[in-house]
């Protein structure tokens, strides 16, 4: 692997790690509601779009699949958990 590829990988890892940390904070917030979840979800999509577009755009596309099928009746903590499962899975393979 090239130095540039390694730098891109580290860049993506850092931002996904930050998303996971923010998501865990949201899950531990007893006031978490659907509006807060939607704000975090939009934020996570924007971060993934910016950080992965020159590395592997499929990361964002694959993220959109499970989040589009999240049952709206689930509690916000479960919704964040579904997103975190995907993000943690990405961290394991990059």
Model-derived features: positions:
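Charged interaction/catalytic cores of defense and host-pathogen modules
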Residues: 2-94
């Amino acid at each position: 692997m090239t130095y540039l590829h390694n730098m891109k990988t580290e860049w993506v890892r850092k931002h996904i790690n930050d998303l996971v940390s923010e998501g865990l904070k949201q899950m531990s917030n007893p006031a978490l509601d659907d509006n807060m979840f939607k704000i975090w979800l939009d934020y996570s999509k924007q971060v993934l779009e910016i950080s992965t577009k020159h590395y592997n755009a499929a990361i964002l596309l694959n993220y959109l699949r499970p989040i589009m099928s999240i049952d709206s009746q689930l509690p916000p903590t479960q919704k964040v958990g579904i997103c975190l499962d995907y993000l943690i899975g990405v961290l394991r393979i990059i």
